[in-house]
Curated annotation (Swiss-Prot):
Keyword field contains Metal-binding: yes
Binding-site list for Mg(2+) 2: 417
Protein name (Swiss-Prot/TrEMBL): Lysine--tRNA ligase
Entries under InterPro entries matching the protein: Aa-tRNA-synt_II, aa-tRNA-synth_II, aa-tRNA-synth_II/BPL/LPL, Lys-tRNA-ligase_II, Lys-tRNA-ligase_II_N, Lys-tRNA-synth_II_C, NA-bd_OB-fold, NA-bd_OB_tRNA
Species this chain originates from: Photobacterium profundum (strain SS9)
Length: 502
C-alpha cells in the first residue's frame, strides 16, 4: 500500500467518524432534505456584480445558496454550484458552531447557506452564514489541484470527480448539450419531425459494421443493438412522414481509438423529394448557423488551425481527392474509373503505398483505403468528398451517368469523417441485388458487411419517394466545437476496460 493510499484511507476514516457524530447530533440522520436554494452563483454575479459595497449594504438582499465547499480561506468558504462559485462568510461565532456541530467542514462537503449578500474589499460577492446547514458529508477527499485530475484514465472512470474539479470538463459537456439542442431546433425549424426507432433489431442494418449481439429471453431469439437507424427511418418515409430525424445512440462492436467509441450518438435524418446536393446545402447552413449561434463566429479554433464553418465547402470526388494528395504518384495521377474497376491494379497501387490488402476487399474498398490513408488526414477544413463507389455504398442511389459510383458524400473536418449522406436507393430490385452482394462479402470474411433485410425490401416495393438521407456524428462534431482531440473527452462515460482485467 502506497503512502498516498494510506493517507487517503486515513482521511476517509476521519470523515466517517465525523459523519457518525453528525448522525447522532443532527436531524435526518445527517442528510437533511428541507433546505431550499433560491439563487445561483452566476445569477447573483450577473444581477449584483456591478453594485457598490454601500449599495448592497443598503439594499440588504437575503439569498439562499447551496453547493459544494471547494476551498477554505480564513473565514471564507468557496461554494460551487452548477453555475459557478460564490463565497460564504463564517464569522468567529459561526466557525465555533461549525466545529461543535460538524467537527468543522471539509473540502467536498455540500452545504446550504442563507444570509445577506455583501461585497468584499477585493470586489467579490459573498453571503454571510446567518443560517446554514450541512446537507451532505463528503466521505472521500477531492484531488488537491483544482484544475482537475492528472491521470486521464481516472478522469474517465470517475467522471463525477472530474466534473467537480475540472471546469474544462464541465464546459465541454455543457457545450455538448448546447450543440444537440441547436441541431434539434434547426431541424424542427426546417419542418423535420423527431422520431424514435428501435434500439434492438432482429436483423442489423443501416451501416457496414460489426454489431453487438444480445438475447431476448421471452422470444428466445438473438437480437442486435442497432448499428444505425437508417432502414427504420426510411420505412417511415415510405409510410408518408416526408421529413424525419432521430438523435440517439448507435452501437458498433469495433475498436477503441481517439475517434471511436463503441457506443456513440448520431443525428440521422431523411427528406423526401431531395437529393444529396440538397443535403450538402442543408449541412452548410446548419453548421454555419450553429457555430455562429454558439461561438459568435463561424470560425472556430481547432488545434493549431482555424476551422471556417462559414461555407460554401469544397466538393471533391474521392478519386480527385486521391490525385490531389498524391501529386507525385504517376500511377494514381493516371487513374480513370475504368482502371479503378481493375482490382489487381488497385491492389498493387495500395500495396505500393504500404497498405495491407485484405483478400475480400472490392475495388471500391481499395479506393476508399487509399483515400483514407493518403487524403483523409489532410482534410482540415470542412470538405465534402463525393462519388463513392457503389460496392461500398449498398444503400445509396447509383449515379445516372456512371454506375460504378453513387450519389453519396462524406463530410470531413479536422482530418476525420463527421457525416455521411446520399441520395437513397429506392429501386427495390437493385437493393435486393446489393443486399445479396453484401451477404456474399460476409461469407467471404467481411464481418462488417450487411445482412439481407427482406422486410426492408418489402417496404421499398410499396414505394419510397425520391429521398436523401444523412447521418452526423454528434461526438465528433462536439470535438470540433470544443477544440477536443479525443472522443473520450466529449462522452460523459466512455467505454473502458474493467480495472480488474489486464
Amino acid at each position: 500500500m502506497t503512502d498516498q493510499v494510506q493517507d487517503e484511507n486515513k482521511l476517509i476514516a476521519e470523515r466517517r467518524a465525523k459523519l457518525d457524530m453528525i448522525r447522532k447530533n443532527c436531524k435526518a440522520n445527517g442528510h437533511p432534505n428541507d433546505f431550499r436554494r433560491d439563487s445561483l452563483a452566476a445569477d447573483l454575479q450577473a444581477t449584483f456584480g456591478e453594485k457598490t459595497k454601500p449599495e448592497l449594504e443598503e439594499e440588504g438582499h437575503i439569498v439562499a445558496i447551496a453547493g459544494r465547499v471547494m476551498a477554505k480561506r480564513g473565514p471564507f468558504l468557496a461554494i460551487q454550484d452548477v453555475s459557478g462559485r460564490i463565497q460564504a462568510y463564517a464569522d468567529k461565532t459561526v466557525q465555533k458552531e461549525l466545529k461543535e456541530k460538524y467537527s468543522g467542514l471539509d473540502i467536498g462537503d455540500i452545504i446550504g447557506v442563507k444570509g445577506q449578500l455583501h461585497l468584499s474589499g477585493k470586489g467579490d460577492l459573498y453571503v454571510t452564514m446567518d443560517n446554514y446547514e450541512l446537507l451532505t458529508k463528503a466521505l472521500r477527499p477531492l484531488p488537491e489541484k483544482f484544475h482537475g485530475l492528472t491521470d486521464q484514465e481516472t478522469r474517465y472512470r470517475q467522471r463525477y470527480v472530474d466534473l467537480i474539479v475540472n471546469e474544462d470538463s464541465r464546459n465541454t459537456m455543457i457545450m455538448r448539450s448546447k450543440v444537440v439542442s441547436a441541431i434539434r431546433n434547426f431541424m424542427m425549424k426546417k419542418d423535420f419531425m423527431e422520431v424514435e426507432t428501435p434500439m434492438m433489431h432482429v436483423i442489423p442494418g443501416g451501416a457496414t459494421a460489426r454489431p453487438f449481439i444480445t438475447h431476448h429471453n421471452a422470444l428466445d431469439i438473438d437480437m442486435y443493438l442497432r448499428v444505425a437507424p437508417e432502414l427504420y427511418l426510411k420505412r417511415l418515409v415510405v409510410g408518408g412522414f416526408e421529413r424525419v430525424f432521430e438523435i440517439n445512440r448507435n452501437f458498433r462492436n469495433e475498436g477503441l481509438s481517439p475517434r471511436h467509441n463503441p457506443e456513440f450518438t448520431m443525428m440521422e435524418f431523411y427528406m423526401a423529394y431531395a437529393d444529396y446536393n440538397d443535403l450538402m446545402d442543408l449541412t452548410e447552413e446548419m453548421l454555419s448557423s450553429i457555430a455562429t449561434d454558439l461561438h459568435g463566429s463561424p470560425k472556430l479554433p481547432y488545434g493549431d488551425a482555424i476551422v471556417d464553418f462559414g461555407g460554401p465547402y469544397p466538393r471533391i470526388s474521392m478519386l480527385n481527392a486521391i490525385k490531389q494528395y498524391n501529386p507525385d504518384n504517376a500511377e494514381i495521377q493516371a487513374l480513370t474509373y475504368e482502371q479503378v474497376a481493375d482490382r489487381e491494379l488497385m491492389a498493387n497501387i495500395a500495396r505500393g503505398l504500404d497498405i495491407y490488402v485484405e483478400k475480400f476487399w472490392t475495388c471500391g474498398q481499395l479506393l476508399e483505403e487509399i483515400f483514407g490513408e493518403t487524403a483523409e488526414p489532410q482534410l482540415m477544413q470542412p470538405t465534402f468528398i463525393t462519388e463513392y463507389p457503389a460496392d461500398i455504398s449498398p444503400l445509396a442511389r447509383r449515379n445516372d451517368t456512371n454506375d460504378f459510383i453513387t450519389d453519396r458524400f462524406e463530410f470531413f473536418i479536422g482530418g476525420r469523417e463527421v457525416a455521411n449522406g446520399f441520395s437513397e436507393l429506392n429501386d427495390a430490385q437493385d437493393q435486393d441485388q446489393r443486399f445479396k452482394a453484401q451477404v456474399n462479402a460476409k461469407d467471404a470474411g467481411d464481418d462488417e458487411a450487411m445482412y439481407y433485410d427482406a422486410d426492408y425490401i418489402t417496404a421499398l416495393e410499396h414505394g419510397l419517394p425520391p429521398t436523401a438521407g444523412q447521418g452526423i456524428g454528434i461526438d465528433r462534431l462536439v470535438m470540433l466545437f470544443t477544440n477536443t482531440h479525443t472522443i473520450r473527452d466529449v462522452i460523459l462515460f466512455p467505454a473502458l476496460r474493467p480495472q480488474n482485467k489486464a
